[in-house]
Amino acid sequence: MTSLTQYFEQHPKLPQTQAVIDVITTITNVGKQITDLLRQGALADIHGEAGAENVQGEQQKKLDVIANDLLLEALTANKHCAGVASEELDDATPANESGELLVLFDPLDGSSNIDINMPTGTIFSILPHNNKGQAAQNADFLQKGTEQLAAGYLLYGSSAMLAFTLSESLDANNEGVVMFSLNPSTGEFELVKNNITIDADTKEYAINASNARHWLPPMQQYINELLAGSSGPRGKNFNTRWVAAMVGDVHRILCRGGIFIYPKDTKDPNKAGKLRLMYEANPMSLLIERAGGASTDALNRIMDCEPTDIHQRVAVVLGAKNEVEYVQKLHQQA
């Protein structure tokens, strides 16, 4: 088996590529610590609420705070990291002014799953620091998803998995999306899949149907067509899947296809969506597109969105290309 270290040694020794590799290595090392804490569960006193809200107005779990602090400490110590932005913190944290990279992360996606031993994960996005030599500020992070140098996630489930992709400009070996599994015997992430591709068609979809009454008409139409099955306009039966953690649903799509949807709804008309553009939608969109899928906010490509705030929210439809394009067509025609 090829370890993560061996895999990275096969890449060209270009300065920017090596900097990105070093940052990904730092993140995966923290992921091993989070994996150990999750395995201990209640024995490590990581269950339950932390007793505070994050900037999103969400109740923080104890492990939300722990994972955030571990990542923040490790990344600010990395010489290549000029600044860090976390879903859990109001503002970006400056790190090393001479660093050439910015890192955004969701320290523990799906943290409501912690106490019931269901999948959670860490999502990350790496951007260039275009004001090298100056302290990183929130505005430095406001780059389109197309500017990402790399993105990925760590999934903490029955096994710990790492999936990531380098941008086309850095992926000299043309390996697209790659996936590693943590070997508990060696403590090393080992390569299990590369050049992952997503089928353009699917029979599986992931959406929280409890919000159906709040969806916009085009989304209601789309899901009703799927529910009609083989006797409806789609002429085939679909299955619903829902992990309650974006990282788990995207992992399933990379492994066996499907479409993931967290649409805009009318519960709070002032919000464009539920998920965060910079910490969740952009990194997952890069992964999905590099695997041959598509990603949209139901009207436009997510990675073309011009961010105005590091905590900006967005609707998300991603996965099987033909399904995503059909959802977008319904919304554009509405």
From Swiss-Prot:
Q: Tell me a GO cellular component.
A: cytosol
Task: Please tell me where Mg(2+) 2 binds in this chain.
Answer: 106, 109, 280
Disulfide bonds listed in the record: none
Q: What's the Enzyme Commission number for this chain?
A: 3.1.3.11
Enzyme superclass (EC): hydrolase
Top-level division of the source organism's lineage: Bacteria
GO terms of molecular function: fructose 1,6-bisphosphate 1-phosphatase activity; magnesium ion binding
Cofactor note as given: Binds 2 magnesium ions per subunit.
Protein location:
Cytoplasm
Query: Which UniProt keyword terms apply here?
Result: Carbohydrate metabolism, Cytoplasm, Hydrolase, Magnesium, Metal-binding
GO biological process terms on file: fructose 1,6-bisphosphate metabolic process; fructose 6-phosphate metabolic process; fructose metabolic process; gluconeogenesis; sucrose biosynthetic process
Task: Share what the entry says about its subunit structure, partners included.
Answer: Homotetramer.
Question: What PANTHER family does the entry give?
Answer: FRUCTOSE-1,6-BISPHOSPHATASE-RELATED (PTHR11556), SEDOHEPTULOSE-1,7-BISPHOSPHATASE, CHLOROPLASTIC (PTHR11556:SF35)
- Which family, according to the similarity comment? Belongs to the FBPase class 1 family.
- UniProt name for this protein: Fructose-1,6-bisphosphatase class 1
Write down the species. Psychrobacter sp. (strain PRwf-1)
